[in-house]
Curated annotation (Swiss-Prot):
Coiled coil: none annotated. It catalyses: N(2)-acetyl-L-ornithine + L-glutamate = N-acetyl-L-glutamate + L-ornithine; L-glutamate + acetyl-CoA = N-acetyl-L-glutamate + CoA + H(+). The lineage of its organism: Bacteria, Bacillati, Bacillota, Bacilli, Bacillales. Pathway: Amino-acid biosynthesis; L-arginine biosynthesis; L-ornithine and N-acetyl-L-glutamate from L-glutamate and N(2)-acetyl-L-ornithine (cyclic): step 1/1; Amino-acid biosynthesis; L-arginine biosynthesis; N(2)-acetyl-L-ornithine from L-glutamate: step 1/4. Belongs to the ArgJ family. The record marks A199, T200 as: Cleavage. Substrate binds at T163, K189, T200, E286, N408, T413. This is Arginine biosynthesis bifunctional protein ArgJ. The active site is at T200 (nucleophile).
Length: 413
């Protein structure tokens, strides 16, 4: 499919229509059905034609899954270099002990043999049901088709990484660095068990920019803190979360670093990709009908702004009210109050879909019908001004519907 670019006056980069993980130069991606799921693609891969700088951030859940342990060790041994990644859905390879680690390493070996690259340049990821061993005969079948052009489509990769997701989530943008076109692409999955500190989510980002691994890791960590770590669907943190980025240096320009004159342009584009993917996860929360954005400003510290935003968007009472299209602002101020952060009710101001509901800690009369009309929209915004400082943050989440229970009551069946 031919990619088309659309440029917004707001950005110094272009959004590529139908852009994807394989849009940057030198990257290919694919996916196929190997039998882990009943009738959907469940095995995917990304390959770079040249060795790439790489970085990753992982779940903070102490029950870290085998693929994450192996990938983290691999990146340490390779000093931040990768050339391929393979991922399966339907099986998390988590809580599987030494056999799980051995299976992840065996997968690395099979992929490396097919691509004729060192196994230490292969990352592995899994998502799905916890506590079951990988069916390695099926995994091997998948690795044997990695070089098969019939399966080498980015759309297939996007589908292969899904679990309870209702849609694929991907994007690519382009920008100019030293007069040359650089592209950043991304693909993610995530729908349930989503909570700040990474969620049941896998996110993969590729770029043909020239940037070293240490710089890439610093950028990824910074971006993750205010994007992927600021989303929540249900308050659960998965054992398998990972965000991984590869930069294969295919575009020859001055190495990107904080000293590069166009560093901020690259950072803005990278953050845009991460924000887009994070919001796509929140929007696709299991059973969700609405995306909730909580903008907190006037906090004494960034940590307070982030914590209050996440507390509001994590509240089941707030989420239920938004689903019911009920302007129950009392649930919002209650969440602010129990967040554990420093607040002053007399300085607190709250808006729901740009309609004031609380001013200096006091309820504000509003037009119930006008408010009800705005709450039928797919995007709901809560603005909180604390009046205590200059720190601000935004958290993303979704409403809580009847379908969330239906989906999760039968996840293994």
């Amino acid at each position: 499919m031919k990619h088309q670019e659309t440029t917004s006056q707001q950005y110094n980069f272009s959004i590529i229509k139908h852009g994807d993980i394989s849009t940057p130069q030198g990257f290919t991606a694919g996916g196929m059905h190997i039998g882990l799921r009943a009738n959907k693609k469940d095995f995917g891969w990304i390959y770079s034609s040249s060795l790439a700088s790489a970085a990753a951030v992982y779940t903070l859940n102490q029950f870290k899954a085998a693929p994450l342990i192996v990938t983290e060790d691999t990146l340490q041994k390779s000093k931040g270099k990768l050339q391929a990644l393979v991922v399966n859905s339907a099986n998390a390879n988590s809580c599987t002990g030494q056999q799980g680690i051995d299976d992840a390493r065996q997968t690395q070996t099979w992929v490396a043999q097919q691509l004729q690259i060192p196994s230490e340049h292969v990352a592995v990821a899994s998502t799905g049901v916890i506590g079951e061993y990988l069916p390695m005969d099926k995994i091997k079948t998948g690795t044997e088709h990695i070089k098969d052009a019939n399966f080498a489509t980015p759309g297939a990769f996007n589908e292969a990484i899904l679990t309870t997701d209702t849609c694929t989530k991907h994007i690519a943008v382009s920008l100019k660095i030293d007069g040359k076109t650089v592209t950043i692409g991304g693909s993610t999955k995530g729908s349930g068990m989503i909570h700040p500190n990474m969620a049941t989510m896998l996110a993969f980002i590729t770029t043909d920019a020239s940037i070293e691994s240490n710089t890439l890791h610093q950028l990824l960590k910074s971006s993750t803190d205010h994007t992927f770590n600021m989303i929540t669907v249900d308050g659960d943190t998965s054992t398998n979360d990972m965000v991984l980025v590869m930069a294969n240096h295919q575009v020859e320009h001055q190495i990107l670093s904080q000293d590069h004159p166009q560093w901020e342009t690259f950072v803005d584009a990278f953050n845009f990709v991460c924000t887009f993917l994070a919001k796509a996860i929140a929007r696709d929360g299991e059973g969700a009908t609405k995306l909730i954005s909580v903008n907190v400003s006037g906090a004494k510290s960034i940590s307070d702004a982030r914590k209050i935003g996440k507390t509001i968007v994590s509240s089941n009472l707030v989420k239920s009210a938004i689903f019911g299209e009920d302007a129950n602002f009392g649930r919002i101020i209650t969440a602010i109050g129990y967040s554990g952060c420093e607040i002053d009710p007399n300085c607190t101001y709250v808006q729901l879909n740009q309609i004031p509901v609380v001013d200096k800690g006091m309820a504000v009369l509003f037009d119930e019908q006008a408010m009800s009309n705005t709450l039928t929209h797919e995007n709901v915004t809560i603005d909180v001004q604390l009046g205590l400082g200059n720190a601000a943050a935004t958290a993303y989440g979704c409403d809580l519907s009847y379908d969330y229970v239906r989906i999760n009551a039968s996840y293994r069946t």
